[in-house]
Each structure stands twice: as structure tokens, then as C-alpha cells.
């Protein structure tokens, strides 16, 4: 049989019909459509997981400021302290996500998942959960497979670029991927993965992409920390059988429609939002003079 899918509903249906997980459907689709065996697919995913680890380490270890002076050292500042209010998982997810985006801002190697501007959410949330529960590599690989299926659906049916759909498309997709990965890793059902996606995306619709000075630093770096925790919140709800009234595919469609209705000033042009505040404008002028 074919494991082709166009929607989240397709993946859920295929998983339930074959009594397999959400991530297993994505794996079988890969094997069915590309000239690779399972070992090769897993090896490629493990390579990306290794880069997750390296980018977290780089972001924490290298504390110098970026050329713009807007970021650098914040992940290390969090890493050397203990949380006052947050759980250990949430605090680590926030720290790791910021670390990866600081690494990105300094041109270290990262995995764009789905974009460079949102590259911290998946590594941050997934590593925090995997470390806390001491999950093995095979389990994390399954989570990565689920996340890749989610990203494929959003990219093909909507958009993942801030220039097209605002930051809701970038950080929103990243958070959905992370939430789905966590549910998969924790043994959740395909339907719970779907609800995690819907709950996650619903609660960031309309988010603008307004980078100061056109750089992927403000508000991007700290925003990754916030939305790594958001992904964990969505996965927690879904695993507790809290359901979204709006199905995931309809939420994705709504995101796409909202994004395309946004003015260009709020879609990565730096012509609106935080980028044109007095402070944002002054930073842009200073950066341009460097």
C-alpha cells in the first residue's frame, strides 16, 4: 500500500489503519519514495541530532557578542543559574533554544527546522525532554520523523517562511514540529500528535516577523526560548487528552490565510513592528554604519 500523505489527517489515518505511530508513517513514506533504506534514513537523522547537540554547546560556550551587539551570552547566563519558577524541562528547553539561535547569529552550524530563524525550538524542546526522561536515541529519532512529517505538510499546504507568512509561519511551524515530536517520543497516539499541532499553532496565529536591522537576532533569539516552552505546553495538554476544537489541517490553513493577509511590513521586511520603533531604528542605523 501507499504511505503518501498530503495532510495531517492523512498521516493519522494511515497510522491508525496500519496500527503504527505517526512517525512510522513518515518513515515508510521516505522508504517508499526515495532511494534509501531505513538505516540510511536513520543515519541522516542521527547526524542532524548530533548537530543539535553541537549548536547547543556552541551557543552556551561562546559568550561573545555578535557584530551587531544585540545577542550573545544569554544562553550561558541562563545555563549557569537555576530556575525560580519554571520546571527543569521548561527551563532547559528555553536555555537550549536560545543557545542554538545565538549560535546561528554567530554563523555556527545549525539545523534549519524548518528555518534558521526558528532553529532553536526543536533542539531545545526535544533535548530537554529526552534528557529528563533519559530517552534512547531510537525514541528521539522517531520524534524527529514525526516532526519532519509535520514540517512537510505545513511547507506544502501553507508556508514556513517569515517573508511569506510572518513569524507565525516560521516559529509556529517549528513549535508544532517540536510539540509533535515530544508527543511521539512520549508514546502518544497519532491523534494526540494532531491535537498537539493544532493547540500549538492556534495560540500563535498572527505573530509578526519584524526583525530589528533585518538581522535574525531581535526578537528572534529570545522568541525561540519562549516557543520551545510553548511547544512543551501543547504536548503536555495533548498527552492529557485535551483536544483542539479546530482540526490541525484547518489551523494550518488559517495560519496560511492570516499570513498572506498580513501587510508586507510585518513579513520580514523590517518595515514595521519592533524594527521601526525608535530604539529599533537607532540600532539599524548603528549596524548599517559598521
Question: Over which residues does each language-model region extend?
Answer:
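Generic N-terminal targeting/processing segments that precede catalytic cores or assembly contacts
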Residues: 1-108, 132, 241, 248-290
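Alpha-helix capping and helix-loop boundary segments enriched in small/acidic/polar residues
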Residues: 84, 113-116, 138, 162-170, ...
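Glycine- and small hydrophobic-enriched segments that form the cores of compact globular domains
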Residues: 85, 112-119, 131, 135-136, ...
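Acidic-glycine-rich active-site phosphate/pyrophosphate-binding loop
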Residues: 87-104, 139-158, 203-211, 246, ...
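Conserved phosphate/anionic-ligand binding catalytic regions in large, soluble enzymes, centered on
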Residues: 107-125, 169-174
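Alpha-helical support elements that line or immediately flank enzyme active sites
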Residues: 123-134, 179-187
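A structural-propensity feature for long, helix-poor, extended segments
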Residues: 145-181, 203-230
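Functionally critical mobile loop/hinge segments
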Residues: 184-290
Amino acid at each position: 500500500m501507499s504511505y503518501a500523505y498530503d495532510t495531517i489527517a492523512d498521516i493519522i489515518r494511515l497510522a491508525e489503519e496500519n496500527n503504527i505511530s505517526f512517525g512510522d508513517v513518515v518513515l515508510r513514506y521516505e522508504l517508499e519514495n526515495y532511494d534509501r533504506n531505513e538505516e540510511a534514513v536513520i543515519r541522516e537523522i542521527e547526524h542532524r541530532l548530533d548537530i543539535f547537540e553541537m549548536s547547543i554547546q556552541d551557543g552556551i560556550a561562546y559568550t561573545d557578542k555578535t557584530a551587531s551587539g544585540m545577542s550573545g551570552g544569554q544562553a550561558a547566563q541562563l545555563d549557569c543559574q537555576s530556575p525560580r519558577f519554571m520546571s527543569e524541562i521548561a527551563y532547559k528547553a528555553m536555555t537550549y533554544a536560545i543557545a542554538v539561535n545565538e549560535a546561528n547569529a554567530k554563523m555556527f552550524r545549525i539545523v534549519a527546522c524548518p528555518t534558521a530563524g526558528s532553529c532553536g525550538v526543536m533542539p531545545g524542546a526535544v533535548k530537554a525532554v529526552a534528557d529528563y526522561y533519559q530517552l534512547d536515541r531510537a525514541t528521539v529519532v522517531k520524534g524527529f520523523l514525526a516532526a519532519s512529517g509535520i514540517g512537510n505538510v505545513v511547507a506544502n499546504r501553507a508556508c514556513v517562511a517569515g517573508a511569506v507568512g510572518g513569524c507565525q509561519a516560521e516559529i509556529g511551524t517549528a513549535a508544532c514540529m517540536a510539540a509533535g515530536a515530544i508527543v511521539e517520543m512520549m508514546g502518544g497516539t497519532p491523534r494526540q500528535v494532531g491535537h498537539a499541532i493544532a493547540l500549538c499553532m492556534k495560540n500563535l496565529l498572527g505573530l509578526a516577523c519584524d526583525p530589528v536591522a533585518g538581522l535574525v537576532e531581535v526578537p528572534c533569539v529570545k522568541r525561540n526560548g519562549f516557543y520551545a516552552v510553548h511547544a512543551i505546553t501543547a504536548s503536555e495538554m495533548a498527552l492529557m487528552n485535551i483536544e483542539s476544537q479546530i482540526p490541525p489541517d484547518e489551523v494550518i490553513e488559517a495560519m496560511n490565510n492570516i499570513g498572506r493577509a498580513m501587510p508586507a511590513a510585518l513579513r520580514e521586511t523590517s518595515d514595521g513592528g519592533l524594527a521601526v520603533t525608535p530604539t529599533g531604528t537607532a540600532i539599524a542605523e548603528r549596524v548599517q554604519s559598521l
